[in-house]
Amino acid sequence: MGMTGNMMLRSWRKGKGVFLNRKDPEALAQRIWQELEVVTPSTNFPVRRMSGGNVQKVLVGREIAQQPSVLMTAYAVRGLDINTSYTIYNLLTEQKMKGVAVVYVGEDLDVLLELCDRIVVLCGGQVSGVVDARTTNKLEVGALMTRVGGGAAENA
């Protein structure tokens, strides 16, 4: 399935069976291909044959195009090259600036401190603290990661 077919997965419920609108998904696929610089010969190229970074761009672009009020990502850049990682980070930051609640699950403290407003820290499957990313540091977050109830967490 190419990018256009992949875009149609999100609009299938809105369609009318065999009379599904194919122009909107094609236009969206073209826009994502160009704006996110997806490296593929065409929007009909099978997504499953693309590199991991390009697949990630297609999926994140498709979800953002739905104009969600909440966008949740888990390890959004795991295994991606640095350029693609920054593309994804920039997309998430743009969404945050538009008022979308972005829930970012990750483990790179530098990235979390840069991207997030608040950080919910887990330890042993339990919340050990909630900190303001603008006023905390890696040492405080690290302390919260190692023991439940420890550290001087500010409830944000």
Regions found by a protein language model. Give the residues of each.
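Glycine-rich phosphate-binding loops of nucleotide-dependent enzymes
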Residues: 1-156
